[in-house]
């Protein structure tokens, strides 16, 4: 199954190169140059993973991650950074990121993380569906 990915970065050249490299690997990639546009896309579409730059002008990756978590807690988010530190990694994970990748991203490693995100999202969605069925059965005394 093809993974659907939203790639968010304010550096357009990086965005275009990464998107093309991901498409060559049969991923369906949508791109966005801002966190606010990404939030609109996430509200309207379904993605297996969001890969987002840690530092963007209007809203950073952590702020965007928190906004996404409020609306779509099942969304798998991988943050990208050009300045990886242990502190940034810890901050990203505490905020709810699935993972954290240093730029320039190793596409093999990133592809594996995206596959993992696809699987994790499917498990979460399945559990949510099961929880709804159980809730309905309990509601009607079954």
PLM region spans:
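Receiver (REC) domain active-site loop signature in two-component systems and cognate sites
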Residues: 56
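Two-component/phosphorelay signaling modules centered on CheY-like receiver
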Residues: 12-30
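Helix N-cap/capping motif at the beta->alpha junctions
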Residues: 31-40, 61
């Amino acid at each position: 199954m093809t993974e659907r990915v939203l790639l968010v970065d304010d550096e357009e050249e990086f965005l275009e190169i990464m998107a093309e490299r991901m498409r060559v690997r049969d991923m369906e990639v949508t791109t966005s140059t801002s966190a606010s546009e990404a939030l609109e896309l996430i509200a309207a579409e379904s993605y297996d993973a969001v890969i987002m730059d840690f530092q963007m002008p209007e809203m950073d990756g952590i702020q965007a991650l928190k906004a996404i978590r409020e609306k779509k807690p099942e969304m798998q988010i991988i943050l990208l950074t050009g300045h990886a530190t242990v502190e940034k990694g810890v901050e990203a994970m505490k905020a709810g990121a699935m993972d954290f990748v240093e730029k320039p991203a190793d596409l093999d490693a990133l592809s594996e993380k995206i596959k993992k995100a696809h699987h994790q999202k499917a498990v979460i969605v399945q559990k949510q569906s099961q929880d709804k069925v159980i809730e309905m059965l309990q509601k009607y005394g079954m």
